[in-house]
Amino acid sequence: INIFGMENEFLQVIINILNNSKDEFERKEFEKKYIFIDTKITQDEIIISIKDNAGGIEKEVINRVFEPYFTTKFKSKGTGIGLYMSKEIIEKHMKGNISVKNENYLYKENSYDGANFLIIFPNKQKIKVN
C-alpha cells in the first residue's frame, strides 16, 4: 500500500499505537506477546488494522482514549496526548478515520483478547480489487 503525504506524521501515529501496546505488555505478564498489522484495499477504502493480545482496553475508558490528556498510565509513563494527536493527524490532516475496539480472535488455534485500532482512508485512486 502506498500512502502519499505526511509520511512522518503517519509513522508517528503507528509508533503511538505500538507504544501503547508495549506499555500494556509491560504492565501484565504474557507468555506470548503479539502485535499484528494487517492492510486491506477495497474499491472504496484502504484499511489498516493494528491489534495486539494485551487484553484490550477497559470498557470504562475505551471511549476516552482519543481525548487530550487522558491517560491510564503513571505521569512518568504517559502524557495522554499520543492517541489524541494520532486522531488529529489521521482525521484532520490525512482525511481518514481512526477508531479502536476490543476484539477476541484466534491465532494458531489459541484465543486472544486485545485492542484493535482501525485506520481507514478513502481509496481515492479507486484501485480495482479482484
For the regions a language model picked out, list residue spans one by one.
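A residue-level detector for a conserved hydrophobic packing site
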Residues: 10-14
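Conserved micro-motifs of the catalytic ATP-binding
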Residues: 2-5, 72
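Acidic ATP/Mg2+-coordinating residue in the GHKL
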Residues: 52
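Short beta-strand/loop element within the Bergerat-fold HATPase_c
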Residues: 32-44
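Detector for a conserved hydrophobic position within an alpha-helical segment of the HATPase_c
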Residues: 90-91
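Short alpha-helical Gxxx[C/S/T] motif in the catalytic ATP-binding
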Residues: 82, 86-87
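Glycine-rich ATP-binding loops of the HATPase_c
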Residues: 94-108
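Short conserved segment of the HATPase_c
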Residues: 57-69
